[in-house]
Amino acid sequence: MSTPDPPLGGTPRPGPSPGPGPSPGAMLGPSPGPSPGSAHSMMGPSPGPPSAGHPMPTQGPGGYPQDNMHQMHKPMESMHEKGMPDDPRYNQMKGMGMRSGAHTGMAPPPSPMDQHSQGYPSPLGGSEHASSPVPASGPSSGPQMSSGPGGAPLDGSDPQALGQQNRGPTPFNQNQLHQLRAQIMAYKMLARGQPLPDHLQMAVQGKRPMPGMQQQMPTLPPPSVSATGPGPGPGPGPGPGPGPAPPNYSRPHGMGGPNMPPPGPSGVPPGMPGQPPGGPPKPWPEGPMANAAAPTSTPQKLIPPQPTGRPSPAPPAVPPAASPVMPPQTQSPGQPAQPAPLVPLHQKQSRITPIQKPRGLDPVEILQEREYRLQARIAHRIQELENLPGSLAGDLRTKATIELKALRLLNFQRQLRQEVVVCMRRDTALETALNAKAYKRSKRQSLREARITEKLEKQQKIEQERKRRQKHQEYLNSILQHAKDFREYHRSVTGKLQKLTKAVATYHANTEREQKKENERIEKERMRRLMAEDEEGYRKLIDQKKDKRLAYLLQQTDEYVANLTELVRQHKAAQVAKEKKKKKKKKKAENAEGQTPAIGPDGEPLDETSQMSDLPVKVIHVESGKILTGTDAPKAGQLEAWLEMNPGYEVAPRSDSEESGSEEEEEEEEEEQPQPAQPPTLPVEEKKKIPDPDSDDVSEVDARHIIENAKQDVDDEYGVSQALARGLQSYYAVAHAVTERVDKQSALMVNGVLKQYQIKGLEWLVSLYNNNLNGILADEMGLGKTIQTIALITYLMEHKRINGPFLIIVPLSTLSNWAYEFDKWAPSVVKVSYKGSPAARRAFVPQLRSGKFNVLLTTYEYIIKDKHILAKIRWKYMIVDEGHRMKNHHCKLTQVLNTHYVAPRRLLLTGTPLQNKLPELWALLNFLLPTIFKSCSTFEQWFNAPFAMTGEKVDLNEEETILIIRRLHKVLRPFLLRRLKKEVEAQLPEKVEYVIKCDMSALQRVLYRHMQAKGVLLTDGSEKDKKGKGGTKTLMNTIMQLRKICNHPYMFQHIEESFSEHLGFTGGIVQGLDLYRASGKFELLDRILPKLRATNHKVLLFCQMTSLMTIMEDYFAYRGFKYLRLDGTTKAEDRGMLLKTFNEPGSEYFIFLLSTRAGGLGLNLQSADTVIIFDSDWNPHQDLQAQDRAHRIGQQNEVRVLRLCTVNSVEEKILAAAKYKLNVDQKVIQAGMFDQKSSSHERRAFLQAILEHEEQDEEEDEVPDDETVNQMIARHEEEFDLFMRMDLDRRREEARNPKRKPRLMEEDELPSWIIKDDAEVERLTCEEEEEKMFGRGSRHRKEVDYSDSLTEKQWLKAIEEGTLEEIEEEVRQKKSSRKRKRDSEAGSSTPTTSTRSRDKDEESKKQKKRGRPPAEKLSPNPPNLTKKMKKIVDAVIKYKDSSGRQLSEVFIQLPSRKELPEYYELIRKPVDFKKIKERIRNHKYRSLNDLEKDVMLLCQNAQTFNLEGSLIYEDSIVLQSVFTSVRQKIEKEDDSEGEESEEEEEGEEEGSESESRSVKVKIKLGRKEKAQDRLKGGRRRPSRGSRAKPVVSDDDSEEEQEEDRSGSGSEED
């Protein structure tokens, strides 16, 4: 063994390669993991020995057979004997031996292939059970001690025992092992090209052992010591499987794993650190300190391992300082490996037991394992095929046999293939393989080959050309591709830009949304402050917003309120000055006379005729101080005599509240008058010093005073004391500067006690009196405005000693009610009801002149008519009931009161202060306070913007609307007091209103459709002698005709007459159930009224048209309903009797039939609890007035208001217009909450709710069924059940009738002349138009007098005196005499004509009376009337203003339709003065009223077309007043000419007034017959159309006059 064999027969390669040798054994690569065992050692306990069928050969180190391992140990022993333990080859072989020790006794489990490879040798010829090279995947579980068979720890110093423990019996002895290690070390050094030292050569040859090798092994510590030694390791990890720890082990140099450090600078292996300089060589160091010092001795820097593709396992459980294995230092490429210097042999090295790193993946072993598995599968398949059953099918058995033989041939085929390959390799020579050209033979070129070469060259050129073309094509394709890429790039860029743009837009949208939210938040905050009346905060937010419009509105409001405040101050100062002047004048007169007559309590001298003589005078006993008041006190007229009879008494001094002011107060006021800047003086009670509430000495009175002041601080503008105490000159505080507390009613009021809210109203009225102001008491209808007025009068009489006279102007219908209330509440007040005939009124004149009365009650008509009597009295107070009658500033009543009557204090009573427009409200305020509210245009300019229906340039938003409405509330609040029933009268039952939609009958639908489309009414043709063929009749005022059709089609007389013939009735009148079948509203009444009568509910039924009331009377007679009727023709004295009869507890009348205008004012009908409004009024307040006849104080039951409305008709439009007008009223009046106690927050919340309510949808247009109607009219469940049973009984009864008909008329029941298509109606209409134009003969007209026979005053007088028929007869006789006179004058003017010709003319005139062609001239008017008309028109045309400009210049002639087409589109009836003059010449006007109508129409057209405030608009208003004044002047001149006696004066006045009324009542000649028929109980058809119109006073607005005139046909038909 002189020559050391290289282990495993590998040939060492020279060079610096650090890689392993060519051995394919266990040294194929290092294991990177911490476990030195195989992968099988981590998969659980090792299985038992292999089966007997698979004997395993004896394995040596590294998994090799024992014989191979024996060959490897021979060189190791020789190296050990030669003393070469330091040789690298020795260490390498020793490492191989240690690696094999790790696998000893731990053979891998048999693979699945081993169980089936029965007798088949391995194709590779190696061991079939080589250890798997798979690294351990789990970290170490901690240090474990290796134990022997007895469980005792093994000593690492005994290698033989270690080897036997690890590998079983081994053939190597100790010397052989040393020699093997030396050979391994030598192999390593030779592989690196390093020279072998002598001792290593000797050790390799086995001559002597390596120095230090003998000492190395015994000194090695056991593996447990190194594993558990101290050190700051990273913590224990899960160790490898149950395999024992490896022995001392050192990897060969250059084959270290990735975690091994490089060798040191002295060539010492990593586990053997060099000796420190200057010290002798030491033996093996003991303890871990040497291990810790080992890495510090290497000067090279340690480089961490490079990461690999596999996850590295956790580090071993060895402290880093004690670990002999360090990370390798990666050698940079290109750097030659420097040979390490040899270590001196005598150097003692410290050897530490290394820990085996896990092996890496071995691809050879993986391949082997794959082969094993294939072999196993093949063997398994052969076994399956051999064991196939014999019953298999033939073809399957053949296939299985073929497969079995093929599998058995596999090994033979593999052996044959190997042999063929070996033979082929032997044929290959060494030189041929190295140099292929060495034996190449040169070839000669022949001619044939030259041609071939040429041909090939040509082919080559073609090929080159083809390649060139192909290259060019590729170039073009690349260009196209580039273009495509270019487009794609820019498309992507564009897409990115679009995305960016979208993102920017989204950002801005989000930003804008956020900004909008912020603005909305600020706006809500602003609205909140505005609603809370936080004016300071609101102004700050307005300044932040920079809203010029809102700031401008606030500025305007401040300026306007400041101006009004100043005007109120001036008004009060002027009133005070007047009072002073009057008192001074009276005092001077008394001083001049030198004697003082008897002075009454009011400071006036007393006489027998004084109006103060009947009032009690308060007296006091001088000694006892006893005061006598009321009935115990003496009368004023008997005061002196009573004082003589009762000595010791004298007149009691008047209190401060009773006196209007003493002389000292007058002097103080004179001194204070030149100082307007000072706040108004506080009352005596408020001038007291308010004590400090924090002080201890606060009396009970002072505490109560403090509480009152705190209570007044709650509201903003009603806290007068608080405002004055702060020195704030608020508008309301200035107006109501003087306050007086009223706790109870006057002692003169008896038979009842005022409610608390009525006491508050009285206090407000007294405050108006004390502050010299006038106001509007606008409590809702039914809250007792009459009682509060009587309380004011009695309070003034008792406490202020103002005994009158008081003028109270009321409607005629409520005059009796006022007299009744005075008799009940204040019987001691002397009242005069100024009404009746002229003789009766004249009887009151002496009493009026003497002044022996306190109150005068009269009507609007007598105020105008008897102004020469009533205006002579100086009234202390003027009170106008239903003050909204003065809503037109130009109405006659307002002008007469302003010009003729003297009354320093005025009061208006109205339940509806705002009915249609804001100028109406201004008219009321102007009448009350003309010095404060001067200009209507200014008032409208300030407050009309939110309510203007046309001409509004900019729509106001909600906030601006609230600001403007709030401005109006500020203006109105001092002068208007309004309380609602729901606020002040809690015990008043609820009022519920329902709108019940009614369907139309077939007759109504047909008539309505043609009237709506063409404006014509279908007839049967009888008026044209085409009876039964049908015809049409054109009617004016289509809306009125549509309303009549909706109410009842029989309101048209010819329709009822035709249907009476069609249905078989005689007399032209329809009776029975066909009365209600023709109208949807009547059919609904037929279902409702029996239920109401059965449950004892009294009904008020309001109608607009008197002819409809007549038809309704026929229906009531048919059903047997007891009823009462009240309309405009009912006398005043009869009205009271009707009310009394209806209100009696046991009255048999359960229906009261009233007209809305006549029966809607001042009537107390609280015994009824159901109100049915048959047809709605254009003015919603008329309907509200009508409802409140039942819903007023004294009502005990819940009130149901049922408003009937025909579905899809003009009535829905009327209802919508009424709602709009009510909406205006809500915004202005109700939202102001002028009730003296509502706080600002409540007012703002109410206004906000109104504005939000506008956005709600309207109700659906559907006709309710019986159940829904029953729910509307039933008050409780029992009534509802009863009504449902009644409906069921009614339907059963109708079903039993064999001749039953539908509830409403069907189309198949209509006559043929009604059912016409549109084309036929168009043809009939054209025929009628042609007849009108060309005059085909005269039509038969009924004898109806259309002239104005009586004025309204004459008619009222005749009604009151009961001489209507006689006066009408006289008028007819006068007309006939005038007519004969005109005829005689015409005959005398033509004396040459014969009598015969004159008789013929008269006959022709009589014939022409029946029907005249349109082209024929009208009969001439009286010359006096024509002269008046011309005079009036000329005066209006020539009128000039102060600058000399003629106002009527633009009104003379209108521009043509071509010049101004929009005027004719907007104005339906254009008229000018030229046309008016022409009509006067053609005698078109039959009275001054007709002329006035056209002049007013001209002015209204100008106001409609032109903007408000323009020059033409203002001129038209002036021309209206000029016309009125000129007409009055001319009428007065006529009146003065005929005054000869008082009787004649009365007659002449009534005669002249016949042409001064704006609305005429047309009396038909058949009235007498009608009255007789009604007395007899029968009814003639003309009676339905011969009712007179309700009385409409001429103080109504022009707009309502026109509506009433246009509706005259509806009430007369």
Swiss-Prot record:
Phosphothreonine found at: 11, 353, 609, 1390
Presence of the UniProt keyword RNA-binding in the record: yes
UniProt-annotated stretches for the region Sufficient for interaction with DLX1: 837-916, 1247-1413
Helicase ATP-binding domain segment(s): 766-931
Residue ranges, annotated region (Necessary for interaction with SS18L1/CREST): 1-282
Biased composition (Basic and acidic residues): 74-89, 1396-1405, 1566-1576
Single GO molecular function: ATP-dependent chromatin remodeler activity
Acidic residues bias (residue ranges): 658-673, 1533-1553, 1593-1603
Residues carrying the site annotation Required for binding to 'Lys-15'-acetylated histone 3: 1505-1506
Summary of subunit composition and partner proteins: Component of the multiprotein chromatin-remodeling complexes SWI/SNF: SWI/SNF-A (BAF), SWI/SNF-B (PBAF) and related complexes. The canonical complex contains a catalytic subunit (either SMARCA4/BRG1/BAF190A or SMARCA2/BRM/BAF190B) and at least SMARCE1, ACTL6A/BAF53, SMARCC1/BAF155, SMARCC2/BAF170, and SMARCB1/SNF5/BAF47. Other subunits specific to each of the complexes may also be present permitting several possible developmental- and tissue-specific combinations.
Listed name of the protein: SWI/SNF-related matrix-associated actin-dependent regulator of chromatin subfamily A member 4
Organism in which the protein naturally occurs: Mus musculus
